[in-house]
A protein has these predicted regions:
Chain B
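Iron-sulfur-cluster electron-transfer modules
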Residues: 8, 15-25, 55, 59-269
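Iron-sulfur (Fe-S) cluster-binding segments and ferredoxin-like electron-carrier domains
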Residues: 36-65, 106-125, 318, 352-366, ...
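Conserved beta-strand elements of the Class I
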Residues: 181-182, 306, 380-383
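Long, charged N-terminal interaction/targeting segments
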Residues: 8-51
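Short cysteine clusters
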Residues: 28-34, 38, 98-104, 108, ...
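A short, charged/proline- and glycine-enriched loop
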Residues: 175-180, 299-305
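Cofactor-cradling patches in redox/metallo enzymes
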Residues: 187-275, 312-329, 335-428
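Active-site glycine-rich loop that binds ribose-phosphate moieties when present
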Residues: 233-239, 285-293
Length: 220, 428, 372
């Protein structure tokens, strides 16, 4: 297989396979979660669980109180850099937007590539810091499973290969681009079945906890 | 009589796993922030006390029983089953080092209600026979005697007599049609009878009708702490029956955290029906009286004081502003503790920890968090609204040789009650 | 022209002076990206080089490659180099026809066995040998037979190098490239549809100078010409960096000469010398004319999902696939939901109420303590 065949495969068959598993997995996981049901709360509620659930979806992304911020500073800061960085890199790079345009039929404006590049670097630094933290912090070292390191790699490889292919470093661009796309496909394949599923289940989790707390009148 | 078994425990966990739990487990990224929020971790530095790790067996069960991949792995013999040894090992994580305080649920960035899951985990632990002896004993006493501390009606009656003598007011018992049914915690009966005095006087001033019930005076619920909905339902059922029999409008949960959770929030779900009466914490009632102008105080508390928010009231109960409104009336020198309100640190003894001797050592260690909070304030008095917090605060301060008195908010208010006759006394 | 004549003799015969010859050597060096210090060595090599015999076979092709080469205007280095070889068989160009033509090939092969250069344009059909024959001989047979005595093979054009358009999906003739068939000879792939003329002659100049084939990339192409990416050498690259893209061929962006990425330019994955060597006597290359690169020097360029589809867009229809996967996920989800609900209903039905008498397991030591 030469680089052109490889590139064609990852843009074609590989993408098909990844999409099938990704979509299948996400839908399956949503069914697995939602059909387990949740008993109706019979206690007289103080607030609208529905409203508070949605509020929690948004507000959980904001920093908590300043002491929590101080105590979990490393996790919170690297977490923000990672997630904002991923957002910029995935959704604001012109070639990525044109990919979404190709799939969904609509696009949005891109930002200039060197800025995306900067975010990619920041995101990778954040991920390296997160890995270091995971390897050295007693709690994280204790909690971490093989899957935690595996999904770290699943997230890091698309970034580094994207960076290397953009800068035409290390390997021939076609190979690098192919590996980049393949690494994203691997990410898609494993996302619904690993803790990376938080990318979409977090909305459900936040909604449930927000509404349960909201019904008690607690701002979650 | 049947007995607990691993199978019953697992079946109970299977019953507990629902959509929120599945969403929570799907969303945890092992970020470790819950550990930073848990006083059992912050004060011991022990990573095994990380809140999400306390429900790890339940996570595996969820995966094995309720996901397609997990089911396949289980069918192929690739998954690790839950064993007796494992759950025995988990007892200290689930019971000794968790007060169900809910701080972890507040900080979790993906919004997992970890505390709620530990509560569910306890269902499996108790049904499986993995609950600590201390909580089993408390549950037995609660069901058989009517109080986890073994307080019987005669003891209450003796306290009523004292209170009637001290206040010069009659304490109503089993009065049908009263507005409020007042519940007490055993600790209030045995250690803090001032509470009974206080509400007697406050209701008298407010001109409200109220009653105690000889068949259901105990508000605490060991079933909630041990994590058995069946036992909790039996205990709540007594209160519900009493409230219905006496046709009261409102049942008042006393100065106790988990009792409020048990009756106010879990109660209707435990007995599977909506209540025909209201449930309020005493602070909610007092704040309502204040707003209606029925709670009149005079004088002020000179001491510099702070308020310790009981977890079950603030984070798990939504009673945050009421104590502050009430303190506003009498305490100009009130200062907030760091992290006060919904983010307040637990005293370290809630959720059954105080009833569990195995947890004594770690409970005292966890108290260091509260000690640091109080030390930084330089205050004369700590006010709270939970008898269990109060005992732990007293114990902890004594061990740490800190001489700060602890007061219940209700009783402090009563001390400043304006001595005038209620306008509607005759008509009430 | 005899095969024994050296290049120098040939050039002299054509009235090229010593000075002109050295100038030619310098140009050849620059084509091959060699330093000027190499010029004397090149001159020495070329002076004594014998004009090699070249046999040019054309299979499934459009003659565009030969056109590209022969349309280059003289006097050019390309032309000079073609004077320096003995093109013994090229059925488009040669005067002979029929049996005579084939005899010329056979004779050239016999005379120069082991020394001649075989140039091939066009792909070879494997589906049915009858799809393409010359004088009754299938392309496959002719290639195999002619390749046997070749010193080296130069595959010219994307059809000969990678199968090209004949191989495009669904590849009705079963077309393959030269390197798919010949495994035991050095092959230089000069891809492009067509290749840049100077690239073809550059390879021949290299062979004449050094008697070897140039250094090749992983696709068998001379690195000298295929080492650079069109995108990297593109004068519109700054617009790509700034995120300024033409969205249609007649919008403002197109008029301002913005990047053509979104209009399907394959520059980022195309390796060729177009952006530097340019076409039509160095006039321009396609992007300068306002059209994206088609990636014609790359394998499968016809099947990369569409010339006007951005490179980052899927080469296939993903939406349809996703819709099926959604359905399958829902079916599997409903299945697992039914199983889960049954499991939950079962444990609820079998639920034995936990009383205070059920809080201990059957642990003899504990039971005794309890009883006492």
């Amino acid at each position: 297989m030469n680089s052109a065949d490889f590139l064609l495969w990852v843009r074609g068959t590989g993408l098909q396979i990844a999409t099938v598993i990704f979509v299948f997995g996400v839908v399956l996981r949503l069914f697995e979660i939602l059909t387990l049901g949740h008993k109706k709360n019979l206690a007289v509620t103080r607030g609208s669980g529905f409203k508070e659930g949605f509020r929690n979806i948004l507000t959980r992304s904001l920093p908590r109180d300043k002491n929590t911020l101080r105590r979990s500073m490393f996790t919170i800061v690297t977490g923000y850099v990672l997630h904002i960085g991923l957002f910029v890199v995935i959704f604001l790079l012109a070639p990525h937007i044109s990919l979404f345009e190709g799939i969904f039929g609509f696009g949005w404006p891109s930002i200039s590539t060197p800025i995306v590049d900067l975010f990619a670097v920041l995101t990778m630094i954040a991920l390296l810091a997160i890995l270091y933290h995971r390897l050295t912090n007693p709690v994280l070292k204790f909690l971490s499973t093989k899957q935690d390191y595996f999904v770290w790699a699943l997230t890091f490889v698309p970034l580094i290969t994207g960076y290397l292919s953009y800068h035409h470093l290390f390997l021939n661009y076609n190979w690098m681009l192919g590996i980049h796309i393949l690494s994203v496909e691997l990410l898609m394949i494993f996302l619904p079945f690993t803790k990376l599923s938080h990318a979409f289940t977090l909305f459900i989790a936040r909604w449930y906890s927000g509404s349960m707390m909201g019904e008690k009148g607690v701002k979650s | 009589m049947s007995e607990a078994s691993l199978e019953r425990g697992i079946a109970a966990l299977k019953e507990q796993i629902d959509a929120p739990v599945a969403a929570f487990f799907s969303s945890c990224t092992h970020c470790g922030m819950c550990a930073d929020a848990c006083l059992f971790h912050t004060e011991t530095g022990c990573p095994t006390y990380t809140p999400i790790y306390k429900v790890e067996p339940m996570r595996r069960l969820w995966e094995q029983e309720y996901t397609l991949l997990g089911r396949a792995k289980k069918a192929l013999g690739l998954s690790k089953p839950i064993t007796e040894e494992e759950l025995e090992k988990w007892q200290s994580k689930v019971y000794n080092t968790c007060t169900l305080c809910g701080r972890c649920s507040m900080v979790c960035p993906v919004g997992n209600d970890i505390t709620g899951m530990i509560r569910k985990m306890r269902e499996g632990m108790s049904a499986g026979g993995f609950a600590p002896e201390g909580l089993i004993g408390a549950s037995e006493r609660a069901v058989e005697i009517g109080s986890p501390m073994g307080v019987r009606l005669p003891a209450l009656k003796a306290q009523i007599k004292h209170a009637e003598k001290d206040t010069g007011l009659a304490i109503p018992m089993d009065v049908e049609g009263a507005e409020y049914l007042v519940l007490l915690s055993s600790m209030e009966i045995m250690n803090y009878p001032e509470y009974l005095h206080a509400i007697t006087r406050i209701f008298h001033q407010a001109g409200k009708t109220w009653t105690l019930c000889s068949e259901a005076f105990e508000a605490t619920n060991s079933g909630i702490q041990i994590g058995s909905s069946d036992i909790a339902a039996e205990l709540v059922g007594r209160v519900v029956a009493a409230a219905e029999k006496l046709k009261v409008k409102t049942v008042i949960s006393p100065e106790c955290g988990h009792a409020y959770t048990a009756i106010r929030w879990e109660g209707p779900n435990l007995v599977h029906k909506e209540f025909g009466f209201k449930v309020q914490h005493i602070l909610e009632v007092l704040d309502e009286l204040r707003a209606e102008g029925l709670l009149k105080t005079e004088g002020i508390e000179e001491a510099k004081l702070t308020f310790h928010d009981p977890c079950q009231l603030v984070r798990r109960g939504g009673v945050v502003e009421q104590p502050r409104n009430l303190l506003d009336m009498i305490a100009p020198n009130f200062v907030e503790m760091e992290d006060s309100g919904v983010m307040n640190w637990c005293c370290g003894a809630g959720g059954g920890v105080s009833a569990n001797e195995d947890a004594d050592k770690v409970r005292n260690k966890a108290f260091n968090r509260k000690k640091k909070q109080l030390e930084s304030l330089d205050i004369d008095v700590v006010v709270t609204a939970c008898a269990n917090c109060r005992i732990q605060l007293e114990d902890g301060l004594e061990i740490n040789e800190m001489d700060i008195p602890i007061l219940g908010l209700t009783e402090m208010l009563a001390e400043h009650l304006k001595e005038d006759k209620p306008v509607e006394e005759e008509t009430s | 022209m005899s095969h024994d004549e050296t290049l120098k003799e040939s050039l002299t015969r054509n009235g090229v002076s010593r000075r002109g010859f050295l100038k030619f050597c310098a140009t050849a060096a620059s084509i091959m990206a060699l330093p000027p210090s190499m010029v004397p060595a090149i001159a020495a090599a070329l002076e004594s080089a014998r004009r090699p015999s070249v046999i040019w076979l054309s299979f499934q092709e459009c003659t565009g490659c030969a056109e590209s080469l022969t349309r280059s205007h003289s006097p050019t280095v390309e032309g000079l180099i073609f004077d320096a070889i003995s093109l013994d068989y090229q059925h488009t160009l040669q005067a002979a026809a029929g049996d005579a033509a084939e005899e010329a090939r056979e004779e050239a092969m016999k005379e120069n066995w082991g020394k001649y250069i075989l140039v091939v344009d066009g792909s070879i059909p494997l589906g049915n040998p009858g799809y393409s024959t010359i004088a009754g001989i299938s392309n496959l047979d002719m290639l195999k037979e002619t390749a046997k005595g070749a010193a080296a093979i130069v595959a010219v054009g994307t059809c000969a190098t990678f199968g090209g358009i004949p191989k495009a999906n669904p590849n009705p003739t079963g077309a393959v490239s030269v390197s798919d068939i010949i495994k035991d000879k050095p092959i230089v792939n000069v891809s492009g549809c067509p290749p840049i003329p100077v690239v073809i002659t550059g390879v021949l100049a290299h062979f004449l100078t050094f008697g070897t084939i140039p250094e090749l990339d992983e696709l068998g192409r001379p690195k000298v010409f295929y080492g650079n990416n069109i995108h990297d050498r593109c004068y519109r690259r700054p617009f790509y960096e700034r995120g300024e893209f033409a969205e249609t061929f007649d919008d403002e962006g197109a008029k301002k000469g913005w990047c053509l990425f979104k209009l399907g330019c394959k520059g980022p994955i195309t390796y060729n010398a177009c952006a530097t060597a340019k076409w039509n006597e160095g006039t321009s290359f396609p992007i300068e004319s306002g059209h994206g690169c088609l990636g014609c020097s790359e394998p499968n360029f016809w099947d990369m999902g569409g010339f006007y589809k951005a490179l980052s867009q899927p080469a296939v229809d993903v939406s349809q696939t996703a819709a099926y996967a959604l359905g399958a996920g829902a079916v599997a989800g409903l299945g697992i939901a039914a199983l889960n609900r049954k499991k939950k209903a079962d444990v609820a039905t079998d639920h034995q109420t936990v009383t205070i008498h059920d809080l201990r397991r059957n642990d003899p030591s504990k039971t005794e303590a309890e009883d006492s």
